[in-house]
C-alpha cells in the first residue's frame, strides 16, 4: 500500500466533484454561532471548498447571545429555503442544545451525517475510507484497529471497515493490553484526542491520525514526532479528507433533491 499525498489527493477529489456538477445545482447552508476564531477559520475553508467544487455556500452567522428558541426558529426558516444540505459549525456556546438543533435538520439535508438515521455517512470516516481505498489498502481479511468509539468517528469507521470485510477491533479507554491489539493490526485508525498518545508504542503499519490536539501552541495529532512515513499528517491530513467528504455528501444531497 502506498500512502498518497493527501493534499494532492483531495485536490483531485474536488476536481472530480466539480465535474459531477454539470446540470446539478447544489447549495450548502453553514450555520455559525458567535465569532470563535477556530470556527471562523473552518467556515472560511468550507466556503472555499464549496466554491472550488461548484457548490453555492450560504453562510448564516448569528451572535453568540442568540437564544435556543430564536436559533431554532432561524434554523426552521433556513430549512424552508430548501438548501441541498445544512451543517451547524461546532462547537456551540454552552447555553445551546446541540442535539436538539441537529434533530431539526431533515435526514436528506444532514450532510454532516450526524443523525443516527441520516442518509449520509459521517464525513470523517467517509473521507478516510475513500482515501484508503484510493491508496489500495486491502480491507478484506485485514486486521483493522480503530481506537476511539465516538458516534461520529470511531463507531461508524468500524462499521465501514466491517462492511469491507475487514476484521475490526474497536478499542477505547477501557481496553486492556492495547499493545497486543496494536501488534496484531494491519492498519490503525486513531481518534483518541491525546497528543502523542501512540508514541509509546512501536508501530510499523499505516496509521490514520484523526487526533486534533494543541501542544506547545502547535496543532498535533495522536502520533507526533515519528519517523513512520505511513502516518497521515496533522495538520493537512484527515481534516482535508473530512472537508472533501462534506462536499461529496452535499452533491449527493443535491442529486437526491433534484430527482
What are these regions (language model features)?
Residues 1-25:
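Positively charged, low-complexity intrinsically disordered leader regions
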Residues 25-35:
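Short beta-strand segments enriched in small/hydrophobic residues
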Residues 32, 87-91, 147:
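Short beta-strand segments
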Residues 38-47, 122-210, 215-229:
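Glycine-rich phosphate/diphosphate-binding loop of Rossmann-like nucleotide-binding domains
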Residues 50-64, 168-171:
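Short beta-strand elements in bilobed, periplasmic/extracellular small-molecule ligand-binding domains
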Residues 70-81:
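Short, well-structured alpha-helical segments in soluble
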Residues 85-139, 196-198:
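Anion-binding alpha/beta catalytic cores of soluble intermediary-metabolism enzymes, centered on
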Residues 98-112, 208-257:
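Rossmann-fold NAD(P)-binding glycine/threonine-rich loop
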Amino acid at each position: 500500500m502506498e500512502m498518497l499525498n493527501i493534499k494532492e489527493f483531495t485536490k483531485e477529489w474536488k476536481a472530480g466533484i466539480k465535474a459531477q456538477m454539470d446540470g446539478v445545482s447544489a447549495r450548502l447552508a453553514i450555520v455559525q454561532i458567535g465569532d470563535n476564531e477556530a470556527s471562523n477559520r473552518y467556515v472560511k475553508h468550507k466556503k472555499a471548498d464549496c466554491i472550488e467544487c461548484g457548490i453555492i455556500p450560504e453562510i448564516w452567522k448569528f451572535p453568540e447571545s442568540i437564544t435556543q428558541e430564536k436559533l431554532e426558529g432561524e434554523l426552521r426558516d433556513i430549512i424552508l429555503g430548501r438548501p441541498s444540505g445544512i451543517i451547524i459549525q461546532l462547537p456551540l456556546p454552552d447555553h445551546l442544545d446541540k442535539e436538539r438543533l441537529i434533530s431539526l435538520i431533515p435526514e436528506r439535508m444532514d450532510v454532516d451525517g450526524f443523525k443516527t438515521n441520516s442518509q449520509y455517512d459521517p464525513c470523517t470516516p467517509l473521507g478516510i475510507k475513500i482515501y484508503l481505498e484510493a491508496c489500495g489498502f486491502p480491507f478484506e481479511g485485514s486486521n483493522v484497529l480503530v481506537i476511539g468509539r465516538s458516534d461520529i468517528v470511531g463507531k461508524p469507521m468500524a462499521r465501514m471497515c466491517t462492511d469491507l470485510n475487514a476484521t475490526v477491533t474497536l478499542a477505547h479507554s477501557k481496553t486492556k493490553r492495547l499493545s497486543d491489539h496494536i501488534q496484531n493490526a494491519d492498519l490503525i485508525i486513531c481518534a483518541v484526542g491525546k497528543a502523542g498518545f501512540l508514541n509509546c508504542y512501536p508501530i510499523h503499519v499505516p496509521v490514520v491520525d484523526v487526533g486534533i490536539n494543541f501542544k506547545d501552541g502547535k496543532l498535533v495529532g495522536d502520533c507526533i514526532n515519528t519517523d513512520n512515513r505511513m502516518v497521515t499528517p496533522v495538520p493537512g491530513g484527515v481534516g482535508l479528507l473530512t472537508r472533501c467528504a462534506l462536499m461529496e455528501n452535499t452533491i449527493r444531497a443535491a442529486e437526491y433533491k433534484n430527482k
